[in-house]
Amino acid sequence: MAAAPLLLLLLLVPVPLLPLLAQGPGGALGNRHAVYWNSSNQHLRREGYTVQVNVNDYLDIYCPHYNSSGPGGGAEQYVLYMVNLSGYRTCNASQGSKRWECNRQHASHSPIKFSEKFQRYSAFSLGYEFHAGQEYYYISTPTHNLHWKCLRMKVFVCCASTSHSGEKPVPTLPQFTMGPNVKINVLEDFEGENPQVPKLEKSISGTSPKREHLPLAVGIAFFLMTLLAS
């Protein structure tokens, strides 16, 4: 029985608003991009690998994962950092900030996943904020002496719409807007003739022509009611 009021409410909601309700309180929906962070991913072993995202997109980082029969002490474990361009090129995390740690390589059922949302504003004081048109850099350092010591990735936040990014749009000037020190003489275009201005009708003493016939209409209505009652 509780589903009936909900169904009635959905029927009353205009169709254009349904996609907005499906987005939830966060606003615009973003796409998800997946990267498997391990030495077998050859893209991470070379400089220049770039993932392009839009504002409000998600980047899912999947840590190395092994089943119970996999290797023990030789399993890959990484600490991921967000660094600047110099730290990205030299694979130096000393000036970076620690983001995630992949240290549960034998997690049950599925690999550990970390997600980064490229949002313009963060609700947390220490949260990360991302801007359209900027590049961000991620590297990792292994906790064991592995052959592939440097895994790195570049993320480019592409140009999203203003509704996604939350940034105020730059106002576009109308075509008739002119620069400073330009005088516009509107009346000179009429060469002395008065422009045709529409005339506004105004009721006298606040009475409308329809109100003048009101007593007659009331009298006719009263006459018809009397005739029907007889």
UniProtKB/Swiss-Prot annotation:
* Tissue localization of expression: Expressed in myogenic progenitor cells.
Q: Which GO terms describe its biological process?
A: ephrin receptor signaling pathway; negative regulation of angiogenesis; positive regulation of amyloid precursor protein catabolic process
Lipid conjugation (GPI-anchor amidated glycine) is at 206
Keyword Ribonucleoprotein carried by entry:
no
The protein's location, in the record's own words, is: Cell membrane
Give the UniProt keywords, A-Z.
Answer: Cell membrane, Disulfide bond, Glycoprotein, GPI-anchor, Lipoprotein, Membrane, Signal
GO terms (molecular function) for this protein are: ephrin receptor binding
Q: Which residues form the Ephrin RBD domain?
A: 30-161
Q: Which family does it belong to?
A: Belongs to the ephrin family.
Provide the function of this protein: Cell surface GPI-bound ligand for Eph receptors, a family of receptor tyrosine kinases which are crucial for migration, repulsion and adhesion during neuronal, vascular and epithelial development. Binds promiscuously Eph receptors residing on adjacent cells, leading to contact-dependent bidirectional signaling into neighboring cells. The signaling pathway downstream of the receptor is referred to as forward signaling while the signaling pathway downstream of the ephrin ligand is referred to as reverse signaling.
| Designated name of the protein | Ephrin-A3
Organism of origin: Mus musculus (Mouse)
Q: What is the lineage of its organism?
A: Eukaryota, Metazoa, Chordata, Craniata, Vertebrata
Designated gene of the protein: Efna3
